[in-house]
Curated annotation (Swiss-Prot):
InterPro entries: UPF0473
Pfam families membership: DUF1292
Organism, scientific name: Leuconostoc mesenteroides subsp. mesenteroides (strain ATCC 8293 / DSM 20343 / BCRC 11652 / CCM 1803 / JCM 6124 / NCDO 523 / NBRC 100496 / NCIMB 8023 / NCTC 12954 / NRRL B-1118 / 37Y)
Protein family according to the UniProt entry: Belongs to the UPF0473 family.
Protein name: UPF0473 protein LEUM_0559
Top-rank taxon: Bacteria
Amino acid sequence: MSENNAEVQKITLIDESGDEALYEVLFTFHSDEYNKDYILLVPEGIEDDEEVDIQAYIFNPDENGDATEEELIQIEDDKEWDMVEEVLNTFLEDDSNFN
């Protein structure tokens, strides 16, 4: 998983209505099982105790390991979703990710 950096990477997503929303990268990880990289995003400016929908995508990292909105791919396989949710739950259970 990527390290928590002082500088948070942000990505703009466009919904079906054409509205733009700014998201912060929560973390990224690579799955050897699927040989893919994943990125998890949260809306910008959320409070620590606020409940949010976390967005997850497959992405192809650039030379710096970063992602852009043009490179995000929907996850469509149920087993793949289960794996991503498992990684997310492990991340959320580790309090050190939020210090």
